[in-house]
Amino acid sequence: DVLTKILLELNDSLEKAATEQNALLRSFDALQSIPNNMRLVASRLEPSGGPVSAISENYKASSVGISDRLRSFVGGEGNLCEQMSREVAHALFLLGAERVLKEMIQTGDREPTPADIDWEVERKLLEQVRRECTAKACTALTSGVEVAAALSRSSADIRRQMLGLDTIRVLGRVECGRMREQGGGLSAAIDQLDTFHDDIKGRLAALMGLSETISAGMVSYLRLAA
């Protein structure tokens, strides 16, 4: 049915979000070594404190700030991705339990009851637990919607901060042009930055899209199940 389809899609989106989260952290960790390579290149191309050295230092400082922010929502204990996954997983479990309890009640209403079981008492208990599962699932889904929105906002903020790194990267490319005869090592480092920047921005966009999809799925379920 429609509700089952929504649950399956939510679970699929959560798995994709976890994959993007892990890949994003790996890309950003790999990115941290490039400013060090730029400094090594600078030591061969210019006196201490030259433009390439300044570019590498500025890039390093900016990327560390972004890395700290990134880990606050996709890395470390209690991050936003983990919170969203936990709330949705909790809701999915409760919703599954609710559906099983509902089927048990329907089966009990249809089938003959053993003489040693008071079905009316059992039915009331099952119905009470079913309602509790529904209420707790709705609470978890509502919380999940809020966390998904926070994750989407944080992803957008990181993408904006990446524009600052893009500016520094462009300055590095300008220096490559100025040192075209001797800046081969610098050019290779900037090429690596190009690759990682594209990858990171793409994964941030994917996380934003997935968090919005998850949020929309939870809202749809709450509306249809009401």
Which ranges hold each PLM region?
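Acidic, heptad-repeat coiled-coil helices used for dimerization/signal transmission
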Residues: D1-A226
